[in-house]
Amino acid sequence: MMRPVVVKEKRVNESQIHVVEEEVRQAKTMDRDIVTHAMKQSFAKLNPKVMIKNPIMFVVEIGFIITFILSFLPSHSSSVPGWFNITVSFILLFTVLFANFAEALAEGRGKAQADSLKHSKKDVFANVVKENGNIVQVSATDLRKGDVVIVKQGEMIPSDGEVIKGLASVDESAITGESAPVIKEAGGDFCSVTGGTMVVSDEITIIITSNPGESFIDKMISLVEGAARQKTPNEIALNTVLTSLTFIFLIVVVTLPIFTNYLGFQIDTAVLVALLVCLIPTTIGGLLSAIGIAGMDRVTKFNVLAMSGKAVEAAGDINTIILDKTGTITFGNRMAHTLLPVGNETIEQVGKWAAISSVLDETPEGRSVIEYVQAKSISYNRELAEQGEFVPFKAETRMSGVDLQDGTKVRKGAVGSVIEWVQSQGGTIPKDVNQKADFISKEGGTPLVVAVNNRIYGLIYLKDTVKPGMRERFEQLRQMGIKTVMCTGDNPLTAATIAKEAGVDEFVAECKPEDKIAVIKAEQDKGKLVAMTGDGTNDAPALAQADVGLAMNSGTTAAKEAANMIDLDSNPTKIIEVVGIGKQLLMTRGALTTFSIANDIAKYFAIIPAMFTLAIPQMEALNIMKLTSPLSAILSALLFNAVIIPLLIPLAMKGIAYKPMSSNALLGRNLLIYGLGGVIVPFIGIKVIDMIVGLFI
């Protein structure tokens, strides 16, 4: 009997191994295709109309053209041999190609994601309900805003919309990657559905909310392909600074021959071009676009759709995060925490009647009571409750329970409601009921009174549990200089208790959705950038007001349209990770800019002595690297300038390692690593290249 079992397990394992191997093979193939496409695009981007968008690399391309033309003209210079011009021109060409490759590689990853999304779009037909009630089948591409469509079990939702009738389980794995279906129903904050998702049970009627080309998937494709990508304000500002530096160095190099002629010697044009290319910030100039695209790509891989690069950058500058208590800081389900008997009652009696009142209660609270009683080994008669008539919770009564066959009425519910119910039947109220209810409220819990007919037995202490690790995460945000504000509809006592347990900096109790706008504006008036999450229509104004608004994919269309980011997993706590990604993007750009500018120091000591040593022998003192010859020094500096770009591509794509710490600590750390490193690495790199080049010159 054992052998078949063993063989079966072996087959399953082999099957799993084959699946994993196939996934790895496909991933390698996709990476190979991306690299191949990026290499082709590197040459396509040499078009001056494309290159002029990056002024720094455009100057390098012009330098390539000049030196390439000079290599075919008769040389009147005795300072450099004939092969020097062509060598310089090819080094400059590869410098531009490496920069183009970095940008094309980042774009290629986005296009690969877009292709997978395009494959998820299938030819779908929709059952449209006409005004006369007739149902007509049309192509999804013919649907318009306002059309009413019926979607049955097993059918694909044809376009974005909102449920106006019915309830169904929807498989959103094509969009979110989450295999578990989600419930969509008419009304409330969970009525929004996305085109391309599948109804796996029941039937719903939806009203279409987007025209062709405007659906959620269409927007995702457009964004990840980069068609909708615009340069962010920080990127534009940095690009302006780098372009200004390039212009200044260009003026210096162009006017330099005037001074050298005055001193009685001439500098070859190719040497001047080499000097210019080595002085301008080509490293960050070649990687700047790739860093921005890769930042958007990292957010997308995290299952968050950013509507613009500006939103990702803003996340990195956030000073304050507004968080809902329910579902974000806490689990959102109040669970039975303990039982408190009143008067002379025992905990066994409270547990018995609490369980009987909850047997038919399918709410999370009801199930948690049963689990608690069973965990405490308190006995109760389940069959007695199952044979009775369930009394569901209503907003008017604020109670639920069961009427047993012998006429006994068991109830659990809000303190005031149960007390009134007991008093209406002639019962007396134990003195410690309100005292213990106040204690539970002060602890941040919710008290439910358990009563049978005209007698109160005790209270159930329901507690909305804080998610594990939240205190540590808020401490990390505090180290980053980010303030956390919890907004909740709870009373001040409950809010204060939860805030203390979770470790948030501030809280706003009895907060209505419209109050969030006031909280956001108050922070913005102090010059702070604010982030918040939301999913309901009533959250839309606040999401629009916030600098970073993260809407849940499960939320309403209004919320998603107001936000500048959408979380496909509908996990409100992800705002913390989004802030981290934004900071990583800004730090990567800043670190590589520092590294690029610091490089100039080493290149200065390489190329300046090489230019002037023959005419001014005293300049040899600046040759601290003891480079082989002037020509070797110039070529080594140019080669290092070119090679460093592809070497830094992985760092630009992945982002530098980020650890939560204060701004001053981060600045000091990055200056040490990328500032000092930007000085030391070129000295070593240029010297090594010079030793190799010296063998051939």
Curated annotation (Swiss-Prot):
The keyword Thylakoid does not apply. The gene is kdpB. The active site is at residue 324. It is found in: Cell membrane. HAMAP family: KdpB. ATP binds at residues 361, 365, 393-400, 412. The lineage of its organism: Bacteria, Bacillati, Bacillota, Bacilli, Bacillales. Its EC number is 7.2.2.6. Keywords: ATP-binding, Cell membrane, Ion transport, Magnesium, Membrane, Metal-binding, Nucleotide-binding, Phosphoprotein, Potassium, Potassium transport, Translocase, Transmembrane, Transmembrane helix, Transport. One of its GO terms (cellular component) is plasma membrane. GO terms for molecular function: ATP binding; ATP hydrolysis activity; magnesium ion binding; P-type potassium transmembrane transporter activity. This is Potassium-transporting ATPase ATP-binding subunit. PROSITE patterns: ATPASE_E1_E2. The keyword Glycosyltransferase does not apply. Part of the high-affinity ATP-driven potassium transport (or Kdp) system, which catalyzes the hydrolysis of ATP coupled with the electrogenic transport of potassium into the cytoplasm. This subunit is responsible for energy coupling to the transport system and for the release of the potassium ions to the cytoplasm.
